[in-house]
């Protein structure tokens, strides 16, 4: 499911990781033809996706990457 709001995607991603940290993973890919970045967080049961083509949103990739790095080093 695509989530339109960044804050909602960020919060749900964190909740998903805290619920099942061993199975949750984060990935992103750039679709050159469309000029969009797609962020995906999944635990194989729940899939969260956020896509954007705005440059301001590209900076958020670093924000969520930092979140997952911080969460994995907490344990």
Swiss-Prot record:
GO molecular-function terms, A-Z: 7S RNA binding
Signal peptide positions (record): none
Main location: cytoplasm
InterPro entries: Signal_recog_particle_SRP9/14, SRP9, SRP9-like, SRP9_dom
Matching Pfam families: SRP9-21
Entry keyword annotation includes Electron transport: no
Subcellular location, record wording: Cytoplasm
Superkingdom per UniProt: Eukaryota
GO cellular component: signal recognition particle, endoplasmic reticulum targeting
Keywords noted in UniProt: Cytoplasm, Ribonucleoprotein, RNA-binding, Signal recognition particle
Presence of the UniProt keyword RNA-binding in the record: yes
GO biological process, one term: negative regulation of translational elongation
The family this protein is said to belong to: Belongs to the SRP9 family.
Subunit description: Heterodimer with srp14; binds RNA as heterodimer. Component of a signal recognition particle complex that consists of a 7SL RNA molecule and six protein subunits: srp72, srp68, srp54, srp19, srp14 and srp9.
Function, in words: Component of the signal recognition particle (SRP) complex, a ribonucleoprotein complex that mediates the cotranslational targeting of secretory and membrane proteins to the endoplasmic reticulum (ER). Srp9 together with srp14 and the Alu portion of the SRP RNA, constitutes the elongation arrest domain of SRP. The complex of srp9 and srp14 is required for SRP RNA binding.
Protein name from the UniProt record: Signal recognition particle 9 kDa protein
Species per Swiss-Prot/TrEMBL record: Dictyostelium discoideum (Social amoeba)
Name of the encoding gene: srp9
